[in-house]
Design a protein with these regions (language model features):
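A structural signal for multi-pass alpha-helical bundles of membrane permease subunits
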Residues: 2-283
Length: 283
C-alpha cells in the first residue's frame, strides 16, 4: 500500500512538477547560456570545436562589456529604475488611500465605485494611448521620464486600489474601533493601526506595480525617442536589433541584467506577496 502511494506520488506529482519546472526555467537557462557564448558559437556553430547547443566550453563576458561600453545600457537601467520606482510610489499612495476609503468608509455608491475602478483596470492600454499622447504633447512632457511617470499610474492605480480594497476588508474593524475609543482620530487609526497590519498587501501591490512599470514597452517606445532617455525594454530591442540583424549575445545579456531587479524583488518579498494576494482574495 505504501509502495503504491509512493508510485502515485511520483507519477501524479513529482513528474508533472519536474516537467513544468523544466518548461518554465528552460528559457531563462537558454538566455544565460546565450549571453555567455562567444560569437563564433552563436553565428558559426559548425566551425566551433566541441560545440554543444546546451552548454558552452568557452564562456565570455564580451557581450556584457559591449552593453556597457558600446551602448547606453547604464542610462537605460537608471531611467527604468527611476520611472518604475516613481510610478510605483505614486500608485501605492493613491491606491492605499483609495482602497481604505472605499472599503472602510460608509458612503453611497462605494461598492459601485470600487467595481468601476476595477473595470478601469481591465480597459486595454491601447484605448488610453491616444488621449494620453495628446496630454503629453500639450504639456510638453514628451521624451522625458515624466511622460511615463505620469501615465503608468493610469493602469497601476486601479489594480492597487482593487487589491488594497480586498485586503482592508479582511482587517477586523474592531482594531480600528478600539483605537477610536482610546481617542485616536480616523487618520491616526489608519496610519498607526490599519496600514501596519496591511503591509503584506501593500508589498504585493508594490511588487506588481513595479514589475508592470519595469517591463512596460508600448508607452516607453512611443513617448521616449532619444537614445539616452530610453528604458531597458525599449533600448535593448531598438539598439540591438537592426533590421534583420540580431545581436543575440548582447540581447540576452541585456535581458538577463534587466530581469535581475524584478527577480530580486520577488525573491525577497515572495512570502509577503503571496500572503497579500491571499488576504485580498479573502476580503
Amino acid at each position: 500500500m505504501i509502495e503504491g502511494a509512493k508510485w502515485r506520488r511520483w507519477v501524479f506529482f513529482y513528474l508533472p512538477m519536474a516537467f513544468f519546472l523544466i518548461f518554465l526555467l528552460f528559457p531563462f537557462y537558454w538566455m544565460i547560456i546565450t549571453s555567455f557564448r562567444p560569437d563564433g558559437e552563436l553565428y558559426r556553430p559548425w566551425n566551433s570545436a566541441n560545440y554543444n547547443p546546451f552548454w558552452t566550453w568557452k564562456p565570455t563576458l564580451d557581450h556584457f562589456r559591449y552593453l556597457f561600453e558600446e551602448t547606453l545600457f547604464s542610462a537605460w537601467l537608471w531611467n527604468t529604475m527611476l520611472i518604475a520606482l516613481a510610478s510605483t510610489v505614486i500608485s501605492l499612495v493613491c491606491g492605499v488611500f483609495a482602497g481604505y476609503a472605499l472599503s472602510r468608509l460608509n458612503f453611497p455608491f462605494a461598492g459601485s465605485l470600487g467595481t468601476g475602478i476595477f473595470i478601469t483596470y481591465l480597459v486595454p492600454q491601447t484605448l488610453l494611448f491616444i488621449p494620453l499622447a495628446e496630454i503629453i504633447r500639450n504639456y510638453k512632457l514628451g521624451d522625458t521620464p515624466w511622460s511615463l511617470i505620469l501615465t503608468y499610474p493610469t493602469f497601476l492605480i486601479p489594480f492597487c486600489t482593487w487589491l488594497m480594497m480586498g485586503y482592508f476588508k479582511a482587517v477586523p474593524k474592531e482594531l480600528e474601533e478600539c483605537a477610536r475609543i482610546d481617542g485616536a482620530s480616523r487618520w491616526q487609526a489608519m496610519l498607526y493601526i490599519i496600514i501596519p497590519v496591511a503591509i503584506p498587501g501593500i508589498l504585493s501591490a508594490g511588487i506588481f506595480a513595479f514589475t508592470l512599470s519595469w517591463n512596460e514597452f508600448i508607452y516607453a517606445l512611443v513617448f521616449l525617442s532619444s537614445p539616452e532617455q530610453k528604458t531597458v525594454p525599449v533600448g535593448v530591442t531598438s539598439e540591438l536589433i537592426r533590421g534583420d540583424v540580431f545581436f543575440w549575445g548582447a540581447l540576452m545579456a541585456g535581458a538577463l541584467l534587466g530581469s535581475i531587479p524584478v527577480a530580486i524583488a520577488y525573491s525577497f518579498f515572495v512570502e509577503h506577496y503571496v500572503s497579500g494576494l491571499t488576504g485580498s482574495v479573502k476580503g
